């Protein structure tokens, strides 16, 4: 059936009737219990979805274009129809409830990508939890511009700074792709590109035709009709839902309680009847209460008939009850669901929940009243109204579902019609029920008919269901000329026309929705409309119309104000330049600002005749006021940042509005100095003032940025008008004056005795404005300000206040004032302190007619005037003992007044100004010490680093980059040496650092050597370049007689008191004054005031002072200043000095200076001659230094060699010295043990003799093939799993620290370790066994290396190295070994269980593992150059370990006995390869346990292997084509060696192959020869390692080199040629002369199981996986890098998430799991089990994970950005991070040598001890790994947040991890975050906690599955399937994961 145009009306009626009468359906009509309610919800959802989809699809005709048949439906019952057949079928609720349908509206996963295409519109896709948000610094207009993973196209952002964030519940947003205003350059949407690729496929044409039906006018009309009806229905339902409104909710409860208590049942029934939802389809069956008299109590005594039926009690979420409070309150309400915790969780998650429901009203009333006694919000709601509200919820969910259908045509139509219906007028307003009469009837006390705001103040609609009048304010022209001390006169309109659209109604009802519905509505409406180019401006305009309503609602009438829609609206709408332009042009900005002012005004008071904001003092549990304040200020700042015309904020109405807002916080927070006792409780009220005033400063700075960017286009008259308004307001305040010297009026005020404020935003604003115009124009604008001191004095008070606090004068006010002062003074983002300096500079310039008055006013404000005038002496001022420190601050202030001139400079361009500021900031941040890029960037104010291009340019100009040297440090930037001279330690930029320490650092860089540091004189940085001409005389006040007197008195104080506290600064100030005078009056000028006041006399006294009085630097500075003064005016100066000190004193001084090379009375000609000689001497010294340097560099060439001592002949027979690491005793007779880590190794791989990739590549050092990425074949994956489980593949790793056995036992007992899990007491390396040792000595044994090679090598022979044992020794070592065997389970538990196993056979197992350890060393050395001898060099510790293991084996057989050679620990089996290195295993076994020479053993082994290899290789090539292809492939990789005639003959003797079709018959032998050499190489190298270990046992001296057959092995083998290496090595280790000789031998082959079917071992490079060259690739192109994946099958949206890890062992992408155990599960199931390394691309970290005991640490990923940074900082700004091979090689070295466990334990330190202890039986159920990050070398590396963690408790080696993942959250107070209380000792108090655990308890984690009884938690997962992880929020994972975490429902996705 098709719907024609004339049928739309009837369809509209059907929709309206169906929705509004849904309560009449029998299935929904009556109340039901909690379980039935859940079934009803599912049925209701399916009913809404089926019906609306059927209607919107033209009676189901177009459903096939939207959905496919659900696969379950076809499988379960093919008879069931896929889609509804008719309207009747669609609304057949019985069919739904009887489960005869399966939802057809499942979205086709194969087409899910289509939903991301957004041709012709913005994307607007809402980010999901776990998905990345991409920001491009170059492309985005600001930080709010983001792209989703589907739209982000890496091609658009090559070489750009692209950074990512992971979407969480708190960092969300929508994709801005397609929004041209959001991007600086056109972007090419990736989703659209994919669509274009698909559209070229002919198979898609049919789908495109099907989609076109949604462009049909009939279908468009249908969509519009359906959406209009559902939105109208939604509005109608929530218009009548006034019960949850905070304005009347309590009144309803009170009224119901009173009616109940007073027995007014009829009135109560009537009241409830009036409140409940009604429409035209209600009938009397739901209630019997009517207005007829027959229902009165008198007519019918039966109350049951009066009470309405079917009512519910609904509890709403709020933000001021915690979990326990809510649970207690719910219990009092006696809910019908016994699971209170589930109810509480639902309230928190959903936002509301039904407490109970009943047909009988009296059954629910008690609970309704009871739950509210504890303050919970509850409503008494009729069942029908609840049903309609649930219907509305599912309608919104249905719309959400529609927005995700992968049909682009449908999306376009649906979204357009959604915008149209929402933005259209709500025409049904008059037809629907008006709640105004109900409110007026029952709440008349709140409903004043004469109040025009009666509707908005109750948050209800006006008459006729219209948007009510808001509290708007209009600023008239008459109020734009000046700023009122209170509030400027404004007009309040009595009426206003609103659009009255559906959108406005839905937003107006925002405070009525519950939490989940509120979020869903916002997620449906805001992204959809904000992404529409057509409806976005309409949406914005309609939001602005009711901005006043929403803002007031948030402040006064919202239960959950943090959920307000206005926040997201501001971000999505007001950040759009077009919208912002419209807002300003329509003057809506004024309405927004006055709406915000209106709310602030509610909390203002009048102080000193001025209206200022005061802290909220009324109870506000929801924090709605704070949220409203912050949101309002953020809105203003956001709009100002998007101003297109910089004149707009300066227009009269706008500037008055902004100034009114700023004025409310001007000096709002005042503090007063406390005296007497210290405060017990510090005042924290300042926080709110600080917070909001900071926002005001941000608004001011935003306005300043806008004006700065478009300075040339601003009307200067607007600037001057603004200056006039502010100065008039600030300058006309009534202040008290006092008279100084009967002639100078200064302002009377005492900072230390009166209330004073830090922050004065208006003063800062005035400073900004004055900076933008010339001083002359600004001065003329001050026409209404007669005394600028009235303005500047408030800034001066702030400066003095900060200084008094800094010196400890306000100590009794507590620490909080110190933090406030620091925040205000040292915060460059505020810029307020420097602006205070600026205003005081202006006072000096503009009040220049009476400079003494200014100086007196400054002295008085600093409370130094009484001292200056002589009324009090120096030691009895108000500051008492802190006077010296306050003067130190005073001098710094005066110096800054004199030298800080940045606000008076004029630059040719904005960039020049910014570059000057950036360079200065960098210089002052780098001079103290070099900094990493991130630290430096954080140190520089944000407004200077918005464009990092400019920052980088300035950084390059002023600094030198120092590359990182270590493996964990960052690169740093160091200030250029030439720039240290430009650093002034008394400048504002150095405010945070002390003068003297800063000066010392600067001098140390300027001085040539340490002795010269004190002699360096720092030059004050004073400049008049680019200065406004009216500011040239800024320093004139310092040349005034009054100020000279101040300086004189201060110098005199220093001399009199012999106090140098402030003398350094004072002399620097004097120096600055002289420098400024020189710039203004010429180089030979000295201020007259400093001549009339004999400053020179005081300088001479300081210069000649004793060394214990003043420091050398002070004396040098005074001497320098005096010298400069004398040079300029010698006669006057000497006359003054002689008058004071006499001739002799002055002559002595002259002589001293002459000895220093300074003639104070020399002529100009003499001075030039002296300087020329000095220059000549300097050049000569320079040549001498160069000569000395040359000699040092070539010292070795000039030294003679005769002094060398030859030590070769000296023999050393003594054994190695053993010292116990614990007791430090080396003389004890106790046996020693060494700690060792004994576990599986991941390095053994099977080989393929026909794979040229294995044999042809050169061993040329560590490498990374970024083209290969991370693909690994299945054989490798299988080998990794086998390596982690097969007992024959274990190795040893040891730190080789010797410990007495008895000391070790005591250590283990004391630390509560076990012998198979402990950390080395010296280096904290994790160990799981000990190896007993004793000293060996070659003395008197006759043993030598040649003997081992030529005659006999066995353990019997080697045991002669032991000294004779006593019987006691035997017993002791025997017991040690017995204990070792027991604790280590024979070093292989499976072998130990064998029936014929005896303790003696342990030596066989140890020998296998020792051979593996040698193999590990050899494999690791393949990565280093030169490969031929790399295994010899830089491996002292490894050889020491090998020697110790061998000694242990020797000692074992010597004490316990020889093993049975009939016993085979790893017997040969047809399908089992125990050891890939079987050939070397044979060599070791024969060498140690057979009385034959080593050469004979090696010869037999290599001969057998070579023959087997050649036969298998040559016979395995079947035809010429195969050979040719193999040869070509091999030649492409490397050089195939040519066989010689001799070698060809030798090869043919073994296998003579004749093959037709070959170009050359020799190529098959060339291949065989080349591959054979590479196959022999590993075993030959291992034999050499074996020999070197033997050499270590019997060498004569420490430095003796390895010599075989008279050849020094390392020198002999050090070359690259493989063939020559093999031949020479074979000559050394076998009985043959070469490989040819080996192959042609006629000796019989030894028969041994190990030499039969020898497995081939991989002989290539073994390392961690190949990584992408750039780490960013994993983030920006994660979908293109096709890695194997491992995740839960329940995880949705996995392809779009960045919270994954990449296993560096096997290359699998491991997705985050809900239980956070993804790493452990991966290692145990699919990879190498014991340990692993995981790359976390999103955070640029590597997680090193140990399975047993479960532990994590985080280290920086081996990627560096261009600034040499690693880790999180490397990618923070989107920098390109490149793989650093050196660091990756270091990580690989840890992995390949089995050193990751030890590295983890060393990093964790003593905390690893807790990890070991908590891994026992008792602790197992409460263990999570301890995530720890490496402490960075750069101390400023930030964001050390806790990372991912895994968990595994191993009961036995075969135990499946799935059986061990259950645990209780925080059962013993120990979790992933560490030990409670932070100390390791606290862990051992867990027993107390455990006793409490057996008590029943509630679960405080609302989002996690609920706790079972604690004892069940303790007993593990077999008693409880829910796994609870502390601090895991399921909402931060995929939502589907939180439903089901049981591993039985999980599988690995590959």
Curated annotation (Swiss-Prot):
Question: Where is the region UBC2-binding region (U2BR)?
Answer: 1165-1200
Identify the keywords attached in UniProt to this record, alphabetized: Metal-binding, Phosphoprotein, Transferase, Ubl conjugation pathway, Zinc, Zinc-finger
Question: Per its UniProt record, what Pfam families does this chain match?
Answer: PRT6_C, UBR1-like_wing, zf-UBR
A cellular component term from Gene Ontology for this protein is:
UBR1-RAD6 ubiquitin ligase complex
Relate the outcome reported for changing residue 321 to Y. Answer: Abolished ability to degrade proteins with type-2 N-degrons without affecting ability to degrade proteins with type-1 N-degrons
Biased region (Acidic residues) positions are 1833-1846, 1934-1950
Binding residues for Zn(2+) 5:
1220, 1223, 1300, 1303
- Annotated Zn(2+) 3 binding lies at 136, 139, 157, 160
Outcome (variant: residue 176 to N/E): Abolished ability to degrade proteins with type-1 N-degrons without affecting ability to degrade proteins with type-2 N-degrons
Q: Where is this region: Ubiquitin-binding loop?
A: 678-681
The UniProt annotation places Zn(2+) 2 binding at 123, 148, 151, 175
SMART domains per UniProt: ZnF_UBR1 (SM00396)
Result for mutant: residue 173 to R/D: Abolished ability to degrade proteins with type-1 N-degrons without affecting ability to degrade proteins with type-2 N-degrons
- Zinc finger intervals, UBR-type: 121-194
Stretch forming the signal peptide:
none
Q: Where does Zn(2+) 6 bind?
A: 1295, 1297, 1320, 1323
Binding sites annotated in the UniProt record for Zn(2+) 4: 161, 952, 1763, 1775
Which segments does the record annotate as RING-type zinc fingers?
A: 1220-1324
**UniProt binding sites for Zn(2+) 7:** 1703, 1706, 1722, 1727
UniProt name for this protein: E3 ubiquitin-protein ligase UBR1
Q: Please name the source species.
A: Saccharomyces cerevisiae (strain ATCC 204508 / S288c)
